[in-house]
Amino acid sequence: MPDHLTSQPAHPVTQSVIDAIGNTPLIKLQKASAQTGCTILGKAEFMNPGGSIKDRAARQIVLDAEARGLLKPGATLIEGTAGNTGIGLAMVARARGYRCRILIPETQSKEKKDAIRLYGAELIEVPALPYRDPNNYVKQAGRLAEAMNAAEPGAAFWAQQFDNLANREAHRLTTAPEILRDLDGRLDGFICAVGSGGTLAGVAAGFAEAGARAEIGLVDPMGAALYAYYTSGER
């Protein structure tokens, strides 16, 4: 047997693709660590089955909605997303037996659109408009779910990642504990970029709950939505 293998599997056999979400490794960033004199680690969220950290939120949103009776067999999962959350939701919806309709800005990459379609979701491309516009993709998703439920109660569930606390809970319950486990609780700081803010808020809450005193930092490029909101108040 090759030296890098053991007699025990690194991961047990899972019963569903959603069970493969999470438990991603921390990888030391060698050049960044050498240049700064610090140990800088990256959490390899690209190793989630849908290819991003958004798989965690997608799973938690769906399981939470099921537990609260908001998402029932035969319903359609609706969301407005710039891409990665849509991929995760399409994957989880397929695994759990739901139809899925994703509204996405038409400017998003072909690769994201193709991935959503490959999971069997219906993709609705809409103009890329700012959040303040009534035809922003998020607001269109909300109206679509509302119209479907008006015609048939319980026909649709709007994931609503930007306001759904299950998004944050995904990271409080999984991302933060994984980091603390793998580092034996020893870390000085955590940084991430944000879209909905779920990762930042959930990891910070998880660290606080565990008594970890790491500094929390938000890194957002100029021109990104949260940077614009922070500096100008524009959404």
Predicted regions and their residues:
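PLP-dependent amino-acid enzyme catalytic core
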Residues: M1-R235
